[in-house]
Design a protein with these regions (language model features):
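ANL superfamily adenylate-forming
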Residues: 115-166, 273-274
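A short helix-loop-beta submotif of the ANL/AMP-binding
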Residues: 67-87, 91-95, 100-109, 209-210, ...
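Conserved AMP-binding
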Residues: 66-69, 90, 205, 215-219
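Conserved AMP-binding A3 loop
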Residues: 34-38, 170-194
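Conserved AMP-binding/adenylation subdomain of ANL enzymes
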Residues: 193-210, 220-258, 273-274
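Conserved AMP-binding/adenylate-forming core of the ANL superfamily
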Residues: 2-5, 25-69, 73-77, 94-99, ...
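Conserved pre-ATP/AMP-binding loop-to-beta segment of ANL
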Residues: 6-7, 21-24, 155-174, 181, ...
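Gly/Ser/Thr-rich phosphate-binding loop
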Residues: 257-262, 271-333
Length: 340
């Protein structure tokens, strides 16, 4: 962790693109498209250049409305590389909640996937304290990303990019609001990198690993565990648009994944599905559970049926996800406990 404590996410991407430019970081199963570290860095820089050319206030919130995939991933990276606050919108939170988030965050621009446009328009109409000038919407293709042509934005040049620091705020993520209105959590580049480092240390992630992201990256688990974990370890990331119990195991095998992070509900879905997976047991090292307590019976049944260890963990949005973790096998794990 100490080696990355003074880094920004822009520094992480630059380092990976310099060291292994042609190695794959992101794979999207629906299109079978691979994005190398160099390509990912270039895409992030392009978005950053447009955002810095958009006349936004320094450190402004840029909301992201998109399902998992290339567009959402590069929208996040481009926003933070540009020195702005990525504000992912929870697509199932409801119009009223999203209206509150857009107002409370003082969002100035929204990177919006085409299929999310009606939801975003309704949320803007529901803003409780509507600003005099509503946030600008830039449409995104779910695979190709933002459509800048016709946006009225002129990008700055890459050499002129203002670089974020480790202390720059990179993320404004809202809690679920189960006990009231959602609460916004600010995390700096240093916080986000520390979050990824915690995952790397606890699970011994290396550049040869490949993680499967089945949780939406508008939640802290999907973003800070799987995305940031792969960024810090310079390892591979496979990101389907949504979780499917029917296709999950085939995707794990097809893309040679070595780990995945899930929540108890998804482990239950996999147990209830009748698919008999063919897996590379030498490659698939572990799964991890977080976001809610994992019932011990589901834990035991899953490991017995699939012979894949589950590492139960615990995290908070305020801490960038993981704060507690059981160890990897063969060390002793505590079923029914996040490692306490």
């Amino acid at each position: 962790m100490s080696s990355t404590s003074a880094f920004s996410i822009a520094d992480l991407l630059r380092s990976a693109a310099s060291a292994t430019p042609d190695a794959t970081w992101l794979t999207t199963p629906e299109t079978n498209q691979n994005y190398s570290w160099q390509n990912s860095f270039d895409r992030a820089n392009e978005i950053a250049c447009y955002l810095q050319g958009a006349g936004l206030n320094d450190g402004a919130s840029v909301a992201i409305a998109a399902a998992n995939g290339a567009a959402a991933s590069f929208a996040f990276l481009g926003t933070v590389v540009g020195g702005f606050r990525a504000t992912p919108l929870n697509l199932v939170a409801g119009v009223k909640t999203l209206g509150f988030v857009l107002s409370h965050s003082k969002t100035e621009l929204i990177l919006c996937a085409d299929d999310c446009r009606p939801l975003v328009e309704d949320a803007l109409a529901a803003m409780p304290d509507a600003p005099r000038i509503k946030p600008k919407i830039v449409s995104m293709d779910i695979d190709d990303g933002p459509r800048w042509v016709g946006s009225g934005i002129t990008p700055i040049k890459v050499p002129d990019l203002r670089q974020p620091t480790a202390q720059t705020t990179g993320l404004l993520m809202y809690t679920s609001g189960t006990t009231g209105v959602p609460k916004g959590v600010l995390l700096s580049h240093s916080n986000l990198i520390a979050a990824g480092s915690n995952v790397c240390v606890a699970h011994k992630l290396e550049s040869t690993d490949t993680g499967m992201c089945v949780l939406p990256i508008y939640h802290i688990n999907g973003l800070c565990v799987t995305v940031m974990g792969t960024l810090v370890s310079k390892s591979g990331l496979v990101m389907p648009r949504r979780f499917s119990a029917t296709h999950f195991w085939a995707q794990m095998q097809r893309f040679n994944c070595s780990w995945f992070s899930a929540v108890p509900t998804l482990f239950a879905y996999l147990l209830n599905d009748e698919t008999k997976p063919i897996l590379n047991r030498d490659r698939l090292r572990f799964s991890r559970s977080a976001s809610a307590p994992l019932p011990p019976e589901i834990h035991r049944q899953f490991e017995k049926r699939f012979n894949i260890p589950i590492i139960e963990t615990m995290g908070l949005t305020e801490t960038g996800a993981q704060i507690l973790s059981n160890p990897l096998p063969p060390a002793q794990r505590k079923i029914g406990s996040p490692g306490t």
